[in-house]
Amino acid sequence: VLKTLFTLLGWFGTLVILFGTTQKPSHVYYIAGAIELLATAVYYRLFFYIALELILMAGHLAIILRIGPYTQLFLPILLCTQLLTFYFVFGKIKIFLVLGILGIAFLSIGLAYNNQWIFLSGSTFIATYSYYAGHKGQHPAYIWAGLNTALALIALYRIFMF
């Protein structure tokens, strides 16, 4: 029952984020959805996705608080470097993981600067890692795979239709 509840919570968070892509300002929706996805990641003990949601929430808060473009650029880069270092120290580095961490940085930077090409790269990298993680047995990762596939498609639409 709890497993189903947290899976549904994750999918609901995904819907909140996707709805947020149609709203101005969108960052409140992104944070609300990220909180729900964070709860799902914590329940399933998915370290990568816990870090992803915390890094993205920090980026959205930096935008909301108008901390400045340099902080909005360097905050996700520094946090992703820490995450990469953590995995390196514990000997857990794999190419798909590196791709996922780069995806977090690109997604956060793409959001901060409203750059759809960077956003597309980030969401594609995270989706790729998530499909890989789901295939390797972390089935809740498919929630993030679905979300980031949809975000990549939205970015493609915005690139070619606007």
Regions found by a protein language model. Give the residues of each.
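Alpha-helical membrane-protein topology signature
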Residues: 1-162
